[in-house]
Amino acid sequence: MEKLTVLILVATVLLTIQVLAQSDGDKHLMKRSKQYATKRLSALMRGHRQCIPQNVSCEEDDECCSNLECKCTSAPDCNFPKCRA
């Protein structure tokens, strides 16, 4: 049932993109909708995940909550970066 739901969502996104591409709409709007559709589809495929809060160890920026980056502040060759603003 879950696979069917994802398939329906993907089909809906693709049809929406096709309709927008064929219309005389604003090109900026089309670009935005494609970006949103891509991000939404990517999020659906990954499933639910929790973000890492500030000052907790991380490996990549994508793991950190909004407006945070995975970085070191103490030394240039830091081995344990944390999510920081």
From Swiss-Prot:
Belongs to the conotoxin O2 superfamily. Contains 4 disulfide bonds. This is Conotoxin Vx15a. Expressed by the venom duct. It is found in: Secreted. Residues 1-23 form the signal peptide. The modification Pyrrolidone carboxylic acid is found at Q50. InterPro entries: Conotoxin. One of its GO terms (molecular function) is toxin activity. Residues 24-49 form a propeptide. The keyword Kinase does not apply. GO terms for cellular component: extracellular region. Pfam families: Conotoxin (PF02950). Coiled coil: none annotated. Keywords: Disulfide bond, Pyrrolidone carboxylic acid, Secreted, Signal, Toxin. The cysteine framework is XV (C-C-CC-C-C-C-C).
